Amino acid sequence: MPFIGADGFCSPIGENWRSVVTSEFGNRIDPITGERRGHTGMDLAVPTGTPIRAALPGTVTVSTYNRGGYGYYIMIDHGNGLSTLYGHCSQLLASVGRTVKAGDVIALSGSTGRSTGPHLHFEVRVNGQRTNPRSYLP
């Protein structure tokens, strides 16, 4: 069941997202290298196969695999310079060009790419600039 806030923004994993944040946006200790570096999104620990939902209505612009980083991932353009990214998925369910509504299942969570365990890496971009997803989630 989608969890959609008053502004129409949907949590990609449901209403319990606050209890499963394992890495915030911003500087952190990289779990693979142990070095301090920026983290471009928010990591939400969920079991492999958890349905991932579109945060807002929009059009899928990327649905592919990136070996060195996001693994299987999807990007959605929501218009007005706003886009979201969903990384480390085990399965992609939405192809490029598909129009989605807030709450539509677009992928299943996983641990593909540069990952230490099953989770969703969730990004929000405004005019191409990564911004803190916590500011948008309901």
Task: Name every feature range the model reports, one short phrase each.
Residues P2-I4, F9-C10, A45, Q91-D104, ...:
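Acidic, glycine-rich catalytic/binding loops that coordinate metals and/or anionic ligands
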Residues G26, G49, Y65, D77-G81, ...:
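Solvent-exposed coil/turn segments that connect beta secondary-structure elements
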Residues G34, N66, C89, S111-T112, ...:
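Residue-level structural signal for beta-strand termini and adjacent loop
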Residues T61-S63, G81, S95-G110:
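...with weaker cross-activation on analogous glycine-rich loops/strands in unrelated enzymes
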